[in-house]
Amino acid sequence: KANGGYTVTTGNVISSDQVIDLRRRLEEINRLNPDEIRSVYRQMLGNSALSSKGGAGLGLIEMAKKTGNKLDYDFLELNKKSSYFILSKTVDTEGIGIHDKENDKPFSGGKISVLERMLAKHSIYLIWSGHLSPDVGKEVIAFTEKKLSEQDIEQSLRKRVFAILVEMIENVAKYSPGREDEEKYGMPVAMLRYKYGRYYISTGNLIRNSKTDLLKGKMDIINSLDSGELREHFRKSLSVQTDEVESTGNMGLIDMAWKSGNKLHYQLRPVNDTYSYFTITTRVDSQVL
């Protein structure tokens, strides 16, 4: 989120021999005004041969057409054969491009490259930071489901990872104090890591201090139980479940531990007199012991 809108950035490895042509295309697009961009776009759509040969060019033109102004980009050399291509665009809430003409500094993808290396170093497969409304939560879950379906992993493992992530994101949404306090004291985070054949699922969110003792008690009880005891605890909790957040949240925590087959590692860090920041991580192995 930036400048009253949102910055969308992608990065991917390309062959270094593609850099000159791709840079030329981007420079040509950025020299066009909005009317010229629409004209070129219509021309490319109307010429099937041109469209099939220049698919990447058509995609870039379409981005410029939809947002209304220039595309920011950078190329970082990785080695003699490969480069890292970074494409970035800042848009307002209506999807219209934002560009600060008074501060027209050359775009640099250095920070994106640092972020990519950090994600790779820590085996972070997916990360989300921001307010998790029910609608946003559904989008994060749908994106994760798509990413998991693309991976060559056992279906039963994929289903367990997905089910646990759904429970964890729903748990975050249940305790949300609202966007304003989250922006002041700590935004929710959801993260999926994959390391040594195991998935690690983590979330973080604000929770009111008045609820921390109850939550800690629930977590400690759940972590003291084995698989059979968790099933029995789930059955008993189900029989007394209500619509209260504490009740439904308890069911979700039990389900996470049961499906993961591992302990729920958690931490409660005081933020101020009103809130603490609650983080939880569980490991998902290929087999539940």
Across the structure, where does each feature detected by a protein language model lie?
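Conserved N-box helix within the HATPase_c
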Residues: 59, 160, 164-168, 252
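Alpha-helical phosphate/pyrophosphate-handling elements in metalloenzyme active cores
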Residues: 138-154
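STAS-typified acidic loop motif
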Residues: 123-141
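GHKL/Histidine-kinase-like ATPase module
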Residues: 108-117
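Short, solvent-exposed positions on alpha-helices
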Residues: 155-159
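Amphipathic alpha-helical interaction surfaces in cytosolic regulatory modules
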Residues: 144, 165-174
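Conserved beta-strand-loop-beta-strand hairpin that lines the nucleotide-binding pocket
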Residues: 1-102, 119-123, 141, 173-289
